[in-house]
């Protein structure tokens, strides 16, 4: 067979059957046939806002003939402040940065002392004891 596709059946129109647009192109041109090569070397769009700048002795004349000159106090000054520093404090001594959770087991003023001895989080005992004291009040 050749490089051409098979002909259409007898009596069919050949108007819609064409050769592929990538015929005769180099392999590197198959990837981006519609984009010019200059497109890849253009700089990206600006990511910073455009700020209108005023210069000293900017003279404006109104239709009435009044002359106005922009001086320093008339300049609009806008600036972005630095973001606030994030809090980065170490945990207190004998306190871990783990979520301590106490699940109440009924409405009882008494708290089983064996619960504190079997605590899997030994650094959270002060937290549990404060819950016990607050529940006893």
Curated annotation (Swiss-Prot):
Protein localization: Plastid, Chloroplast
GO CC terms, sorted: chloroplast
Major location category of this protein: plastid
InterPro entries for this protein: YCF72
Keywords: Chloroplast, Plastid
Family label: Belongs to the ycf72 family.
Protein name: Uncharacterized protein ycf72
Gene that encodes it: ycf72-1
């Amino acid at each position: 067979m050749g490089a051409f596709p098979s002909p259409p059946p007898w009596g069919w129109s050949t108007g819609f059957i064409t050769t592929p647009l990538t015929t005769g192109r180099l392999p590197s041109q198959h990837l981006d046939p519609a984009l010019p090569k200059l497109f890849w070397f253009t700089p990206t769009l600006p990511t910073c806002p455009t700020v209108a700048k005023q210069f000293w002795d900017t003279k404006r004349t109104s239709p009435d003939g009044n002359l106005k000159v922009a001086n320093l106090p008339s300049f609009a000054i806008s600036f972005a402040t630095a973001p606030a520093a994030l809090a980065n404090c170490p945990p207190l001594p004998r306190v871990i940065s783990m979520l301590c959770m106490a699940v109440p087991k009924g409405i009882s003023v008494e708290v089983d002392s064996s619960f504190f001895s079997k605590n899997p989080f030994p650094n959270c005992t002060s937290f549990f004891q404060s819950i016990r004291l607050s529940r006893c009040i």
